[in-house]
């Protein structure tokens, strides 16, 4: 899948994701958010095939893992969804023509729609 590799979003907050492709449709990933040079958030990520579909599984900090089912896949976009989760309910990855990666999380928080976008560029994986 085209999200394999290392990615970084910059701005007031820096976010990184590192993805490794496994066999089939499976991948392993790690994400972290850095503010003022300090990691304030980390997550372990998986994309895994199950009998009923493909799932994006995120385990944030020390919390239990949360699964999001793949609901849309085309050559340039993957959308994962879990409408029972508090926030986000949807995770979106998009491949941009310049080789960068677009990611977004969206859903409803405190009764109001919320969306956070990440424009990510490829890094060299160390």
Spans of features found by a protein language model:
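Central antiparallel beta-sheet cores of small beta-barrel/beta-sandwich binding domains
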Residues: 3, 9-10, 14-84
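Short coil/loop residues immediately preceding or within conserved phosphate-binding loops
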Residues: 14, 88, 115
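Short, conserved beta-turn/loop elements at beta-strand boundaries and strand-helix junctions
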Residues: 24, 98-99
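Residues that cap or initiate secondary-structure elements
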Residues: 35, 53, 62, 86, ...
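Well-ordered alpha/beta subsegment
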Residues: 75, 80-82, 86, 91-95, ...
